[in-house]
Amino acid sequence: MEVIRSERAGFCMGVALALKKLDMLVEKGGHVGTFGPIIHNPFVLEEYAMKGVRCFGSVQAVKEALEPFYVFLETIDEEKRKEGQLQLNLLIRAHGIPYSTESFLRNLPHVQLMDATCPRVKEAQNAISKATQCGQGTRTLLLFGDANHPEVDGLVSYAKGKYIISPEPEKLIEYAKKNPGEEMVLAAQTTQDRAVFDTIKKALFEAAATQPIIWAT
């Protein structure tokens, strides 16, 4: 049997950038961790775990990891502090994290936070934040995606008002039909099918009494 490897096989741009940033932190030394799995690949995660990289699944886990830093704060001299021995170098996963979580982590003492969110995901987060703000009011976000996916957790956290998530186009279209006077923003999880997204976009234009604001990821 002949096995042909696609020329495009390998990590996507966002994942490749995230791993590059993580490699830089590992080479630098010190305490290194990621908030959430850096990517969804158990073999890669195991490789980094063997290098001493910790994967934190919650803010509480990060706070618990910092406790030894606080306990020995008074016994660590200034030189060691400058060398980063009293610092956790924490990398945000490629899928991104919720806005409130990122803000909290940035304000934690002894945490140096580095953002490894995929540039396309970060662009989507910022666009959702901007598009869902309407003067003093807000617009409803219709998100085409999987509610259980970590990227989606981050995306909807940037919505200024309410949001509807569904991987089923019909449900998003149905919501628009039932709320014709409501201003809406359409966005998608970055891994969703563009052709299906365009179908939803077209249907929303036809269904809404007032044209919804459309934004595509």
Predicted regions and their residues:
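The feature marks the mature, well-folded catalytic cores of soluble enzymes
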Residues: 1-217
